[in-house]
Amino acid sequence: MTMEHGEDCCVKVAVHVRPLIGDEKLQGCKDCVSVVSGKPQVQIGSHSFTFDHVYGSSGTPSAAMFEECVAPLVDGLFQGYNATVLAYGQTGSGKTYTMGTACKEGSHIGIIPRAMATLFDKIDKLKNQVEFQLRVSFIEILKEEVRDLLDPATAAVGKLENGNGHATKLSVPGKPPVQIREASNGVITLAGSTEVHVTTQKEMTACLEQGSLSRATGSTNMNNQSSRSHAIFTITLEQMRKADPIMTLDGMPIEEMNEDYLCAKLHLVDLAGSERAKRTGSDGLRFKEGVHINRGLLALGNVISALGDEKKRKEGAHVPYRDSKLTRLLQDSLGGNSKTVMIACISPADINAEETLNTLKYANRARNIQNKPIVNRNPVADEMKRMRQQIEYLQAELVSARGGVVLDDVQGLRERISMLEQKNEDLCRELYDLRNHGYTDPCEPELQKIGTGYTKGEGLKRSLQSTEPFDVPMTDSVRAGSPKDIDDEVAKEWEHTMLQDSMGKELNELNRQLEQKESEMKMYGSDTVALKQHFGKKLLELEEEKRAVQQERDRLLAEVESLNADGQTHKLRDAQLQKLKTLEAQILDLKKKQENQVQLLKEKQKSDEAAKKLQEEIHSIKAQKVQLQHKIKQEAEQFRQWKATREKELLQLRKEGRRNEYERHKLQALNQRQKLVLQRKTEEAAMATKRLKELLEARKSSGRDNSGMNGTSPGSHMTEKSLQKWLEQDLEVMVHVHEVRNEYEKQSQLRAALGEELAILKQEDVMSGAASPPRGKNGNSRANTLSPNARQARIASLESMVTISSNTLVAMASQLSEAEERERAFSGRGRWNQLRSMAEAKSLLQYIFNVAADARCQVREKEMEIKEMKEQMTELVTILRHSESRRRETEKQLKQREQAAVTATTSPGNGNGSVKHSADDSNTPLSPVAVPAQKQLKYSAGIVNSPSKGVPAFNKQHLKMVPMAQLPVGKKVSIAGQSGKLWRWKRSHHQWLLQFKWKWQKPWKLSEMIRHSDETMTRTRPRPQLLPHRPQRVM
């Protein structure tokens, strides 16, 4: 395989920020990674990084990752360029999901399925021009062993369970292991791996699925399906392009040497994630796998650091490819013959801030790696090209020999042929690129327009020929013209004729409408004339009637005048008028009477109506009264119920208020304690981080001084004290790194506890109406003890503390990352470069031995002290338990004595008996007795502090109530001997009863006690002596 040199290009780096997963949300994790809007820039804490692409979070959507990053690599694969897609990141950051390594048939999630689909789509488009061959291989690196995942024997072994419950894999006996080989041209190959020829996407997906099932996976605390190995899925594409044939002198093509071979590989790498044993909870086999994973990733990080350092690259520094099989296989992808895209998968959770920061740092270094991708051609193609040039040279010489052509002309022809071939190749390549990118010829729209115009012209011709009434005779001048002019004239005449026809039709339509309107107008005019004639006739008839009426009036007037002329008629008229007047007078009188009767009836009707109205009002008032009374009762009952409900609610609110106040104080105290703890831990972390930073800066400056000294005087060497000081400083740095690491772990645990409580409270807040709210680790539910306001206050306080803790974690992660990075730079051989002789090494080794011995002795002494303190603590715990049990027993007996005393003193008619029982019970070992003390009783014997007589010595003593068990033995004996006289004296004085009650009862019952004491003294008399035997205990 030969290679054509290309231009250098940098490794492209894309960052994929996955969202928070369910476990992280339950822990209350916050986003510690922010993406600058509109820019491929990521910020975490005080660090800022710029990459080629950023996906997820507030950056570019993840769906665009393939088109922007991987699709160009697939296109380059058809041009003969190798390509690599590398997924790197912490365990559980989404590498396998992003790559799609574990996809199944029909899935389109991930880079690998989409790459396969794009690859076969392009093959389908070019299969008529190029002959393709596809091969795939799938390997994994498990515990520094290369395993073939496509080998049927390996796949048939499957997974077995070992004693620890972990899944492991067995090797196939008799099968040689896969070996890494390097060809003469520097290409890395795998000897013994299986390469499967595929022709369809389904076959390739089946190979991927088979290898994924055989890959080593396991469950950890951070991921249920964690990849335990580095997986590399390789697609090899071979192309055979047909070139232009070479013609012989006889014009016959040479068929045997007209092909071009290209071979390119696409490596899709899914790395196992870096992990910490404390976070993953791995042990046994899982722990060993994690160690090998971290070792391979460390070697990869060293390779990235060596290639990304421009100074080392210019100096030609050694790149440790051979430190790991992973870096050995990725030698071409990192700094070699490949176009490489690195996808850094990160988690935005604050608990993963340190690992996220380290991933971003490695990805940032990877951007500085320079690759040199070149076109990979088959050696057969080179040989064909060489033979083609030789044939052309021989043909030119033969032509020159036969035709006597001058050699200079032959040379010129050769140059011209080379130039034309080069131009032809460029044109072919351009045509190939245009076809691949779906290029469209800009002349095609114009050709379509011309074709459309020509088709339209043909249609016009056919229409003109079919239109016989509009045929126009052609003149001689037209006949004599060219065919093009004739066609134009015919087209114009046909268009004019069609226009005239359309206009004629429009005019006919207008005439028809006009005639219709005129006929309507005529019809309306004839109707108007008929109406006019009708109303004229009516007017004439009315005039005739008017004249007839006037004539009748005149005739009647004449008759009246003729009647007035007759005298007899006049007398009769007078008589009739007189009679008429009399009748009119009677009518008037009757009308007046009628009017009076009507008026009386109206008044009676009014009075009846008033009475009826009053009766109705009375009934209405009575009904309203009954309703009002009923309403008053209802209102009173409702008010009583309302008042009772309100009082009940008020009591509940008061009780709730007291409970809330208690909860508030309790939460305030809890928040204050947690804030103090958080503040203390934060301050300790800040101090440790600050001290670590100072030590690192001091070591860095001392390292520069030492390097400068060594550079100025190569022969000089450090003194013994300088070496010891330097070693002490390095040990101090390691100790502080360990301290910061411990503080980081404590802060993480505190952060997890706060997050868990916050998640539980938020879930309870959402499900506050549920019957059984979720419980925490201690099994207690806060839903029954926290009110909504208290819960919200607690949530706000926890969110504030979680934010502070998250910021602290991010800052500590940044410092730890820097410390580990510097420690990595000083580790290995770099730490001991300052030693110049064996004597210095021996001296330093002796000093290290002394330091280790002293440390071991101090550890042993501390262990002995811890053991002694544990023993003392055990003894003190035992004593404390015994004391606590005695205290509980004492409190129980004291409570029983108090109940017995209260029962005895409050029983009516049994004052003496009560006093006797109480007094006799006081002789028990744990009963109170009167002994001298510095505290005096508030009240002396007697009623209302009356001075006591007859017993001055006893009343003047200072008394104190103490348990009998705390008295010495001699005191107990003396008290036992004097008890008879003492209690006889108490029973002979009834005033002691009041003093006893005042001592043990409630103060506000003093007046009742005094009255009861006076009544008791008047009714009872003291007995002459006490009974000799001890009475039973009053319970």
UniProtKB/Swiss-Prot annotation:
<dbReference type="GO" id="GO:0045893">
    <property type="term" value="P:positive regulation of DNA-templated transcription"/>
</dbReference>
<comment type="subunit">
    <text>Homodimer.</text>
</comment>
<dbReference type="GO" id="GO:0007018">
    <property type="term" value="P:microtubule-based movement"/>
</dbReference>
<keyword id="KW-0539">Nucleus</keyword>
<feature type="coiled-coil region">
    <location>
        <begin position="380"/>
        <end position="437"/>
    </location>
</feature>
<dbReference type="InterPro" id="IPR027640">
    <property type="entry name" value="Kinesin-like_fam"/>
</dbReference>
<feature type="region of interest" description="Disordered">
    <location>
        <begin position="882"/>
        <end position="928"/>
    </location>
</feature>
<dbReference type="GO" id="GO:0005874">
    <property type="term" value="C:microtubule"/>
</dbReference>
<comment type="function">
    <text>Microtubule-dependent motor protein involved in the control of the oriented deposition of cellulose microfibrils. Involved in wall biogenesis and modification, and contributes to cell-cycle progression and cell division. Acts as a transcriptional activator in gibberellic acid (GA) biosynthesis pathway. Binds specifically to the DNA sequence 5'-ACCAACTTGAA-3' of the ent-kaurene oxidase 2 (CYP701A6 or OsKO2) promoter. May regulate CYP701A6 gene expression and mediates cell elongation by regulating the GA biosynthesis pathway.</text>
</comment>
<dbReference type="GO" id="GO:0003777">
    <property type="term" value="F:microtubule motor activity"/>
</dbReference>
<keyword id="KW-0493">Microtubule</keyword>
<feature type="compositionally biased region" description="Polar residues">
    <location>
        <begin position="902"/>
        <end position="926"/>
    </location>
</feature>
<dbReference type="InterPro" id="IPR036961">
    <property type="entry name" value="Kinesin_motor_dom_sf"/>
</dbReference>
<keyword id="KW-0963">Cytoplasm</keyword>
<protein>
    <recommendedName>
        <fullName>Kinesin-like protein KIN-4A</fullName>
    </recommendedName>
</protein>
<feature type="region of interest" description="Disordered">
    <location>
        <begin position="697"/>
        <end position="720"/>
    </location>
</feature>
<keyword id="KW-0961">Cell wall biogenesis/degradation</keyword>
<dbReference type="Pfam" id="PF00225">
    <property type="entry name" value="Kinesin"/>
</dbReference>
<feature type="region of interest" description="Disordered">
    <location>
        <begin position="766"/>
        <end position="787"/>
    </location>
</feature>
<feature type="region of interest" description="Disordered">
    <location>
        <begin position="1014"/>
        <end position="1035"/>
    </location>
</feature>
<dbReference type="InterPro" id="IPR001752">
    <property type="entry name" value="Kinesin_motor_dom"/>
</dbReference>
<dbReference type="GO" id="GO:0051231">
    <property type="term" value="P:spindle elongation"/>
</dbReference>
<dbReference type="GO" id="GO:0005524">
    <property type="term" value="F:ATP binding"/>
</dbReference>
<keyword id="KW-0805">Transcription regulation</keyword>
<keyword id="KW-0804">Transcription</keyword>
<dbReference type="InterPro" id="IPR019821">
    <property type="entry name" value="Kinesin_motor_CS"/>
</dbReference>
<feature type="coiled-coil region">
    <location>
        <begin position="850"/>
        <end position="904"/>
    </location>
</feature>
<feature type="binding site">
    <location>
        <begin position="89"/>
        <end position="96"/>
    </location>
    <ligand>
        <name>ATP</name>
    </ligand>
</feature>
<keyword id="KW-0010">Activator</keyword>
<dbReference type="GO" id="GO:0005856">
    <property type="term" value="C:cytoskeleton"/>
</dbReference>
<feature type="compositionally biased region" description="Polar residues">
    <location>
        <begin position="778"/>
        <end position="787"/>
    </location>
</feature>
<comment type="similarity">
    <text>Belongs to the TRAFAC class myosin-kinesin ATPase superfamily. Kinesin family. KIN-4 subfamily.</text>
</comment>
<dbReference type="GO" id="GO:0009832">
    <property type="term" value="P:plant-type cell wall biogenesis"/>
</dbReference>
<keyword id="KW-0341">Growth regulation</keyword>
<keyword id="KW-0067">ATP-binding</keyword>
<feature type="short sequence motif" description="Nuclear localization signal">
    <location>
        <begin position="971"/>
        <end position="987"/>
    </location>
</feature>
<dbReference type="GO" id="GO:0042127">
    <property type="term" value="P:regulation of cell population proliferation"/>
</dbReference>
<keyword id="KW-0238">DNA-binding</keyword>
<dbReference type="GO" id="GO:0009937">
    <property type="term" value="P:regulation of gibberellic acid mediated signaling pathway"/>
</dbReference>
<dbReference type="GO" id="GO:0005634">
    <property type="term" value="C:nucleus"/>
</dbReference>
<feature type="compositionally biased region" description="Polar residues">
    <location>
        <begin position="704"/>
        <end position="716"/>
    </location>
</feature>
<dbReference type="GO" id="GO:0008017">
    <property type="term" value="F:microtubule binding"/>
</dbReference>
